[in-house]
């Protein structure tokens, strides 16, 4: 707890499959997935979220949001907002406004479709929604891919704040600088296997990049 653990790897080496297994999007064939000693192996996505894992998916439009839906509708994904099957519109709108304001999402209104936002603002809404769950663990997969520098810095600050609050972040990224700057511990994945584990400052960017493409680490 209270740390950012980075998983560094080039796309296609198994990190996406690993996260899908942890978050319930793909079945686990062997081994176990646990959080706080609780077995969540092959549980449903909702069961896993309820167990304390929030998830920022690598594809913000395929997995992280419903592009045709409004900001308000996207902001409520994963939250209890209905009573006896009746949607509380006031609660939905209020929740969305709070997230938009707190995470500096540039939008016209909660009724705007998320697909109409810039990539950075759409991503900030997704991050806001997952952070609002206040889970002990958040998994962030390629959280800053394809967005502007301002949004990158803002999201990085949110992940660090999450760590500083005593919670944990599992950061999956192919961006070397992101992994190096944010992670307290780093695992390198290559061809579906963990090929290295390092503490902050114990490996440089060149050596890390070499491991990510199947090379050897010659650092002492």
Where do the PLM segments sit?
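Glycine-rich phosphate-binding loops of nucleotide-dependent enzymes
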Residues: 1-220
């Amino acid at each position: 707890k209270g740390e950012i653990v980075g998983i560094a790897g080039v796309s296609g080496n198994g990190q996406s499959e690993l996260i899908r297994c942890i978050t319930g999007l793909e079945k686990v064939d062997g081994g176990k997935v646990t959080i706080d000693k609780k077995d969540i192996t092959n549980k449903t996505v909702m069961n896993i979220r309820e167990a304390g894992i929030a998830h920022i998916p690598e594809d913000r439009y395929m997995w992280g949001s419903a592009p045709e839906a409004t900001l308000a509708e996207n902001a409520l994904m994963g939250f209890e907002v209905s009573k006896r099957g009746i949607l509380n519109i006031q609660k939905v709108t209020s929740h969305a406004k709070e997230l938009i304001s707190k995470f500096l999402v540039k939008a016209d209104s909660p009724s705007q479709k998320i697909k109409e936002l810039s990539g950075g603002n759409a991503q900030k809404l997704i991050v806001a929604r997952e952070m609002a769950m206040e889970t002990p663990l958040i998994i962030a997969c390629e959280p800053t891919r394809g967005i502007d520098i301002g949004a990158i810095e803002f999201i990085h600050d949110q992940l660090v704040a999450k760590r500083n609050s005593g919670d944990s972040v599992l950061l999956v990224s192919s961006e070397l600088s992101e992994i190096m700057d944010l992670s307290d511990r780093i695992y390198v994945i290559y061809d579906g296997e963990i090929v290295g584990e390092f503490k902050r400052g114990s490996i440089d960017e060149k050596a890390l990049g070499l491991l990510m493409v199947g090379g050897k680490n010659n650092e002492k």
